[in-house]
A protein has these predicted regions:
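A generic structural signal for well-ordered alpha-helical segments
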Residues: 16, 79-80, 105, 136
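A conditional alpha-helix N-cap/helix-loop micro-motif detector
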Residues: 21, 91-95, 125
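Conserved beta-strand scaffold positions in the cores of enzyme catalytic domains, especially
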Residues: 25, 62, 85-87, 143-145, ...
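N-terminal membrane-anchoring alpha-helices
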Residues: 1-22, 218
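A short, well-structured juxtamembrane/interface segment
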Residues: 14-35, 176
């Protein structure tokens, strides 16, 4: 059931995006055809998960703040779960959500979408949470960076029925997190900055916010599979 809900919702969104907005996806050739994958992106609006899922065209799963599940009807909660969302308690180490994510990522075709900022930041990127690092390190799978521009105008989820404006989704090259063992706090923050820098470099400078310098820095904790990488 979840697969069909996800596929139907994404197809419907692609239709409305094509009809009512100037919607373009760049870098689709960077999306791995198979294998488990973590997707990381900047977070501008409530419709970001849907925009991202319809762009990468994989059966994505999401970690979503638990308050979203608490503020909707039972039918709304059913749809959220059917679409692939799982509640995450923010402000603490949610071990239940972490176990769920790691279990999901064992599936051969798993796609887990994360917004490291943890909350919407319309316009420019803000500081990300460090939880992405231990999760990605334990999973040991490719990470796909995505930069979304122009989505900040879609503040209401109802906007998916009539999106407007220019929306750009830019998909970067997959990369790996090169860490072993437990990192110090400083190294963890540096790894987070690199992950966010790989998102920021896909965005206009005005969107980069706290990660303007990270987008231009040398990458140490992350690398792609290409010899030409940093």
């Amino acid at each position: 059931m979840a697969f069909f809900v996800h596929r139907f919702a994404n197809r419907a969104l692609r239709v409305t995006l094509a009809l009512f907005s100037d919607f373009k996806i760049e870098g689709q050739e960077n999306i791995p055809a198979d294998g488990p994958l973590i997707v990381v992106a900047n977070h501008q609006s409530n419709v970001d998960p849907a925009i991202l899922a319809t762009s990468i065209q994989r059966n994505a799963r999401f970690l979503s703040k638990d308050t979203i599940f608490n503020n909707v009807t039972p039918a709304g909660r059913w749809f959220l779960r059917a679409y692939g969302a799982y509640p995450l308690r923010r402000g603490e180490m949610d071990l239940k959500a972490l176990r769920w994510a790691l279990t999901e990522l064992k599936r051969p075709t798993a796609t887990l979408v994360l917004f490291p900022e943890g909350t919407r930041n319309p316009g420019s990127m803000k500081s990300a949470h460090s939880g992405i690092v231990p999760l990605a390190a334990r999973a040991g799978i490719p990470i796909l960076p995505v930069g979304m521009e122009g989505v900040e105008g879609m503040r209401s989820v109802l906007r998916i029925f009539k999106p407007k404006g220019s929306i750009r989704v830019r998909i970067g090259r997959p990369f790996h997190l090169n860490v072993q063992g437990k990192l110090s706090r400083n190294d963890t923050e540096a790894a987070v900055s690199e992950i966010m820098g790989r998102i920021a470099v896909l965005l206009p400078e005005s969107y980069r916010g706290d990660y303007k310098e990270a987008a231009e820095a040398t990458f140490v904790f992350t690398s792609t599979n290409e010899l030409s990488d940093d």
